[in-house]
């Protein structure tokens, strides 16, 4: 019997494929018979024979190509390369039959036949029916099992289907996840290519919000069936978020500098009639955004100079990550500790080292308050970074700022925890004074910057947490007497009166507020020292610590609903008259206000 597949006529093969069946008779139909006559002459129940014939065709095409005859091979490749919306595009059934035949011949799809494989990988499949998707998924599994060199390409292709496309539906992403999960289970080595593929396909920060959200949501879904990549993926997402965060602060700072130039006359004097634009003003201006996204906002890529849109993008991304972490960190499984440790690692490796970061750090601020054990871990990391002399001094400065801001603002902190942290800091100050108080230096701020940063954090904590620093457990309205403060707090007296003079080098905003609170609560009177320092500033120039507190009030709209229940707002002290001290007015007006007040 002559073989049907022995024909090299691709049109005849197309007829066989188009009809999806093959004649059950051993007689070969005449090739000149019309398609309707041919269709009526074949059996609808002989799918097995059809598969045998197609496998033979695929083998023949590959054999012919090896011998230099590319006709059958190219015809096969074109079936998958054809665009699905063209007139002559093959149907899903046609391609499915060919895929089944290719699946039985994956051992022959080596690098010499990579063009055919690439056409299959580039073909449209996620939008086809379930039967086709299952067939395609089986092909992928068999391909990388037999030809591991295609594994990186297959992983990249699958991850690319997690990206946003205007015509994508939820079911399309479900198909991509199903195929990826199958491949990972079938070929364990595929895990080694997963994270690198995810990282490579991350949208750029100037892409649309919908593109960012779609990809991140899909990647977080991958983490649910591949828990081993949760840590690296969280770090990658936080890294992307922090890039946007920093860019916003750069924009705000640049706008602030431009406004400073506008309100200064040619002679260098300040124009009193002009509006003074501070970082706080810009902050409010750029954060007056809607909590809900419009369709036009979603589909339009944000301009890098549009701070308002960048903040909306940052807000939505943080909300998504907050929501994902909420379900993970509140679970009862041990995985919650793995997720939290991943957050801690990202904080230490990235966030803590990023000075301009404004909002990303609230992920750890919120997460660390979900469990007392989480709180202890976070504070342990901060104190180790801050108080360890082997750490770089820039990192220690950042650690000191974070301790001060966290202890002041974290609402869930227990009184005992606050007292322990403050006691650790004051004991460190005491030990530092014992060692360095009598050292002479021309640049005290540079040489003793960590000392000043820790003192500044203690001042800041005192203003917010004076109630918790009292021994008495009476109501919040009470005014403690000097003997009611926790042991160790008296070290601040020695520090303030020391030759290192922290009130001179700490932020004026913090110093003035500390002076008011400490005087009102009868803790100590420091206005005379401030006055001496003011005179020294006029002689020597103005040089103080930055008033950077990373957990300043949270201004993003949508994600703030998650942060606010855990946030300790500034509260006026009972009985304190804000205007009771007039002697600090000259000092305050002679200094440069460093952005938004930390109170």
Curated annotation (Swiss-Prot):
Pfam families: RRN3
Localization: Nucleus
Residue segments, region Disordered: 577-599
GO terms (BP aspect): transcription initiation at RNA polymerase I promoter
Protein name per Swiss-Prot or TrEMBL: RNA polymerase I-specific transcription initiation factor rrn3
Location, primary (coarse class): nucleus
Biased composition (Acidic residues): 577-587
Gene Ontology molecular-function annotations: RNA polymerase I core binding; RNA polymerase I general transcription initiation factor activity
Residue stretches spanning the membrane: none
SUPFAM superfamilies referenced in this protein's UniProt entry, alphabetically: ARM repeat
Cellular component per GO, a single term: RNA polymerase I transcription regulator complex
PANTHER family registered for this protein in UniProt: RNA POLYMERASE I-SPECIFIC TRANSCRIPTION INITIATION FACTOR RRN3-RELATED, TRANSCRIPTION INITIATION FACTOR IA RRN3
Record's keyword annotation contains Cell inner membrane: no
Highest taxon in the source lineage: Eukaryota
Keywords of this entry: Nucleus, Transcription, Transcription regulation
């Amino acid at each position: 019997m002559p073989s049907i597949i022995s024909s090299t006529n691709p049109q005849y093969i197309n007829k066989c494929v188009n009809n999806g069946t093959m004649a059950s008779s051993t007689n070969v139909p005449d090739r000149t018979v019309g398609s309707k006559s041919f269709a009526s002459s074949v059996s609808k129940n002989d799918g097995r024979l059809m598969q045998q014939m197609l496998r033979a065709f695929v083998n023949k095409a590959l054999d012919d190509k090896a011998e230099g005859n590319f006709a059958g091979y190219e015809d096969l490749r074109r079936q998958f390369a054809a665009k699905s919306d063209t007139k002559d595009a093959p149907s899903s059934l046609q391609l499915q039959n060919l895929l089944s035949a290719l699946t039985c011949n994956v051992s022959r799809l080596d690098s010499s036949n990579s063009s055919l494989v690439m056409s299959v990988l580039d073909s449209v499949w996620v939008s086809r029916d379930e039967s086709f998707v299952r067939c395609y998924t089986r092909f992928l599994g068999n391909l990388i099992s037999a030809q591991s060199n295609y594994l990186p390409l297959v992983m990249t292709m699958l991850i690319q289907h997690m990206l946003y496309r205007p015509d994508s539906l939820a079911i399309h992403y479900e198909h991509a996840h199903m195929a990826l999960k199958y491949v990972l289970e079938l070929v364990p080595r595929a895990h080694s290519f997963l994270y690198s593929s995810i990282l490579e396909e991350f949208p750029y920060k100037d892409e649309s919000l919908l593109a960012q959200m779609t990809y991140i949501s899909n990647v977080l879904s991958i983490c649910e069936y591949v828990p081993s990549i949760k840590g690296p993926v969280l770090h990658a997402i936080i890294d992307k978020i922090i890039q946007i965060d920093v860019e916003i602060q750069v924009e705000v700072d640049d706008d602030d500098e431009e406004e400073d130039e506008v309100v200064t006359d040619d002679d260098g004097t300040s124009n009193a009639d002009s509006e003074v634009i501070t970082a706080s003003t810009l902050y409010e201006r750029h954060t007056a955004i809607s909590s809900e996204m419009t369709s036009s906002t979603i589909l339009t890529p944000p301009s890098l100079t549009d701070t308002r849109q960048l903040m909306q993008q940052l807000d939505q991304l943080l909300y998504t990550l907050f929501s994902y972490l909420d379900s993970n960190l509140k679970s009862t499984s041990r995985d919650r500790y793995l997720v939290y440790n991943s957050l801690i690692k990202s904080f230490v490796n990235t966030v803590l080292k990023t000075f301009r970061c404004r909002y990303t750090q609230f992920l750890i601020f919120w997460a660390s308050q979900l469990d007392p054990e989480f709180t202890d871990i976070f504070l342990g990391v901060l104190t180790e970074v801050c108080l360890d002399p082997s750490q770089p001094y820039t990192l220690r400065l950042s650690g000191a700022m974070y301790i001060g801001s966290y202890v002041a603002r974290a609402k869930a902190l227990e009184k005992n925890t606050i007292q322990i942290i403050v006691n650790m800091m004051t004991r460190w100050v005491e030990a530092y004074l014992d060692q360095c108080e009598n050292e002479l230096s021309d640049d005290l701020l540079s040489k003793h910057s960590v000392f000043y940063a820790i003192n500044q954090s203690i001042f800041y904590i005192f203003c917010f947490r004076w109630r918790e620093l009292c021994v008495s457990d009476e109501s919040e309205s009470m005014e403690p007497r000097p003997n009611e403060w926790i042991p160790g707090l008296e070290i601040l007296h020695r520090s303030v009166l020391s030759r290192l003079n922290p009130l001179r080098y700490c932020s004026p905003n913090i110093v003035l507020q500390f002076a008011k609170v400490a005087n009102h609560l009868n803790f100590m009177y420091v206005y005379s020292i401030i006055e001496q320092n003011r005179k020294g500033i006029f002689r020597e120039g103005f040089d103080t610590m930055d008033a950077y507190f990373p957990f300043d009030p949270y201004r993003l709209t949508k994600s703030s609903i998650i942060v606010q229940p855990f946030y300790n707002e500034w509260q006026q002290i009972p009985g304190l008259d804000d205007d009771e001290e007039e002697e600090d007015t000259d000092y305050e007006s002679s200094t440069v206000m460093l952005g938004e007040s930390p109170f």
